[in-house]
Regions:
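Glycine-rich catalytic cores of cysteine/serine-nucleophile enzymes that process amide/ester linkages
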Residues: 15-89, 126-127
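Short, surface-exposed secondary-structure edge patches
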Residues: 2-7, 32
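Loop/turn positions that initiate beta-strands
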Residues: 10-12
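A structural motif
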Residues: 75-80, 91-122
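Residue-level preference for non-acidic, small/hydrophobic
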Residues: 41, 102-103, 142
Length: 196
């Protein structure tokens, strides 16, 4: 598998599923959340990586990794990747969100959350405040630049109906729910190629 960079756009959302034999935490995340995926990241512009790269939040800190990093994981058979796209964003908004990731998300300390905390997120997911957690996690750090650039009624973590309240404790399940209600579009068939 390789990413077709002509089909990727800045601010696309990478949705990952770690299936490595030693990925017990990833399996736990999926199980607790009832989610296909256990990881989220943002497609960002990167001159260093020749076009696009992945704004990735993993221990110990958020960093930029090449698309090849995820291609290698998929091709080794230990990872699955889907690409979700926020509907109705202009290219200017996409570029601003991509740049804002560097400003707001890059270098942030990864959270030391536990599966118990994730279970709490799932079952009290309508809390009107963010649960107190040191650091940030991948899903939260992925949406941070969207929240800075877009009004609430266009934010990908908004509830689908007015008054478009934002989800305060974002998890991989949040992105799956927004896909189901049409806020996000799955563009994997266009972006992920196997014909090399």
């Amino acid at each position: 598998m390789y990413f077709d960079q002509s089909e990727l756009l800045p601010a696309d959302i990478l949705v990952g599923r770690n299936e490595a034999p030693d990925a017990s935490k990833a399996r736990g995340i999926r199980s607790v959340l009832g989610s296909w995926s256990n990881h989220n990241a943002l497609i960002v512009r990167s001159a260093e990586h020749g076009g696009y790269a992945v704004g990735d939040t993993t221990p110990p800190r958020a960093m930029v990794v090449s698309l090849h990093h995820y291609e290698d994981l998929v091709n080794a058979g230990t990872y699955k990747v889907r690409i979700y796209r926020v509907r109705d964003l202009s290219m200017d908004e996409r570029l601003r969100i991509s740049l804002k990731w560097y400003e707001l998300s890059y270098g942030r300390h990864y959270s030391d959350y536990t599966l118990l905390q994730l279970a709490l997120f799932r079952f009290v997911n309508h809390l009107p405040f963010r649960l107190p957690i040191r650091g940030t996690w991948c899903s939260e750090n992925t949406v941070r630049p969207f929240t800075a650039i877009l009004p609430d009624d266009r934010n990908p973590i908004r509830k689908p109906d007015p008054p478009f309240l934002l989800k305060k404790n974002v998890t991989p399940r949040t992105y799956a729910n927004r896909l189901e209600c049409g806020i996000l579009e799955d563009v994997t068939e266009r972006t992920n190629r196997n014909d090399k």
